[in-house]
Amino acid sequence: MEELRVELKDKKYPIYIGYDILKKFLKNYRDNYSFSFIITHSFLYDLYKEDLEISQEGIIYVPVGEKSKSFKEVIRISRELAQRGADRKSAIFAFGGGVIGDLTGFVASIYMRGIRYIQIPTTLLAQVDSSIGGKTGINIKEGKNLIGTFYHPDAVIIDIKTLNTLPEREYRSGIAEVIKYGMIMNQSLFNFLEKNTTSILNKDIDILSHIIRESLICKKYVVEKDEKESSLRMILNFGHTFGHAIEAKGGYKRFLHGEAVAIGMFLATYLAYKIGFCDYSVLKRLQDTLLSFGFDLNNPYRIEDLVGYIKRDKKAYGGKIRLILPKEIGKVEIVENLEEKDIIKALKAGDGYGK
């Protein structure tokens, strides 16, 4: 087992990474609170109820999918907590993927003006990305995560064993976020991904531990430098400007988050290449790596149809589009001076972009 620590001005918390560690750490943390509640999906509870060791009274189920990140679910969960006696010394445990983590964190941040919570991510995507950093959020029709807070957990417990029951498509979706870290700041991680594709797809425990740890070190570094996303933290959104637009256009049903981010990273890198921001070799290596992990890189939507979503992206300001574009493998920059028409023109120039 390994331990990392997130060190912020007003909050410090551990990240535990190991195999079959869930039961031990869950018991240790549950003893710290007056009441403990687990927010999860029913199928996850059925798979791990022996590890969770909690009665049905302590479980609050959430439907699967991005549609659960809604005001409707926030109100329902908050009422469930109130009816079951949750007080200010209670804690809620997010046991699931990014949807569960984002939703649970948001509820924790506003219920009784803030109660404690623990992240227990069960998907690769949540383990390497969304479970740390304190971002919580829900979706509205106009875009993803437009309503949210910054609210950090007491701890993050990453049990690699939970990836054994993760469907292949969900697992691959998480790999996109690992590739992102390689692209934005860790060239050696990107090289490792290129050389160990088969072992990663086969869920080799030692290989998984390595890429999870390396990803978290990247995320931890950025969050500690820029907790509230005023500057540096924006680079974590590489691929997400286009990716979130693609997710929203598809009604949060057609694509998993990582699938949309994979297309988004490819579009951003293609754009960078077309405007002379990066060499073709950067685009080619990213393309080859994404394809080797089984991602479909075809954007099914017209670029013009995505622009409305892109202009509502959280990084945008004054109607201007901000994009994270790669200079080379392991280095990206925030680009603010691109015109909408130039983005559309550049992306439409390539075969397979839009219809």
Swiss-Prot record:
Belongs to the sugar phosphate cyclases superfamily. Dehydroquinate synthase family. GO terms for biological process: amino acid biosynthetic process; aromatic amino acid family biosynthetic process; chorismate biosynthetic process. It catalyses: 7-phospho-2-dehydro-3-deoxy-D-arabino-heptonate = 3-dehydroquinate + phosphate. NAD(+) binds at G98, V99, I100, G101, D102, T122, T123, K135, K144, T162, L163, N164, T165. This is 3-dehydroquinate synthase. Binds 1 divalent metal cation per subunit. Can use either Co(2+) or Zn(2+). InterPro entries: Dehydroquinate_synthase (IPR050071), DHQ_synth_AroB (IPR016037), DHQ_synth_fam (IPR030963), DHQS/DOIS_N (IPR030960), DHQS_C (IPR056179). Its EC number is 4.2.3.4. Its cofactor is Co(2+); Zn(2+); NAD(+). Catalyzes the conversion of 3-deoxy-D-arabino-heptulosonate 7-phosphate (DAHP) to dehydroquinate (DHQ). The gene is aroB. It is found in: Cytoplasm. GO terms for molecular function: 3-dehydroquinate synthase activity; metal ion binding; nucleotide binding. Zn(2+) binds at E177, H240, H257. The keyword RNA-binding does not apply. It comes from the Bacteria. Pfam families: DHQ_synthase (PF01761), DHQS_C (PF24621). It comes from Dictyoglomus thermophilum (strain ATCC 35947 / DSM 3960 / H-6-12). Pathway: Metabolic intermediate biosynthesis; chorismate biosynthesis; chorismate from D-erythrose 4-phosphate and phosphoenolpyruvate: step 2/7. One of its GO terms (cellular component) is cytoplasm. Keywords: Amino-acid biosynthesis, Aromatic amino acid biosynthesis, Cobalt, Cytoplasm, Lyase, Metal-binding, NAD, Nucleotide-binding, Zinc.
